[in-house]
Amino acid sequence: EISEGLVGSEMCIRDSVNSIKKIIKLKDPTNIVLEKWKRPNGLNISKVSIPIGVIGIIYESRPNVTSDVASLCFKSGNPVILKGGSEAFYSNLILSKLFRKSLKKNKVDENFIQFIDIKKRTVVDFLLTKMSRFIDVIIPRGGKGLVKKVQDLSTVPTIGHLEGICHSYVDKDANPKIAQNVVYNAKLRNTAICGATETILLHKQIIKKIGNSILKSLEE
């Protein structure tokens, strides 16, 4: 249900805070030497991780996306422009203001994180077709319709998926009890999220052993 993702309950806020704290603890992903080699002429070449640049995020509903994306982009050194759905407009606006306030307090340019505080859908079209000089990549986060629109119209490079890609695979050596619990959790813990399992793949040698029990648990 879309309403589930919009509820700003104490638990949801606590989960968002915990998510931010986990991101803070992650190692800096930039300026890491991923690979290096020496050419026959003596030239040393290094492959180093760097920020992508300005990232545009177009997403629907969930306010937690605002906090997660803002945190991840700041952690990775990528300025971000956020365009959230109208369903959670005011929650997103408040969250973005809190992030900007925190940046300013810590003497960081608050414009590192920007939120488009306009509800009109034409803003999305403008981002996709008129901002190629200012945005390096656009990432859509939402339903199939949104992702397809972004991929069809964008003059900016995009990172996204069109069809569902969430699979759960059970190998032939898997513990049946654990496998059943994992598949059940992946599919039914929260069916509203885009990360819920859509396809279950079973190794042919384990189908007879666990197939029916998995299906039965999902049906119940």
Listing of model-derived features with the role each one plays in the protein:
Residues 1-13:
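Short, small-residue-biased leader/transition segments that mark boundaries at the very start
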Residues 17-36:
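Membrane-anchoring hydrophobic helices of lipid-metabolizing enzymes
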Residues 22, 40-47, 114-132:
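A structured beta-alpha segment of the ubiquitous adenosine-cofactor-binding alpha/beta core
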Residues 30-102, 106, 154-160:
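Conserved small-residue-rich beta-alpha loop and adjacent elements
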Residues 61-64, 68-79, 98, 105, ...:
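ALDH superfamily catalytic-core signature
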Residues 82, 114-117, 139-142, 158-161:
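General beta-strand structural signal in soluble alpha/beta enzymes
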Residues 100-116, 136:
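A glycine-rich helix N-cap at a beta->alpha junction
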Residues 125-137, 149-152:
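Active-site/ligand-binding-proximal alpha/beta "capping" segment
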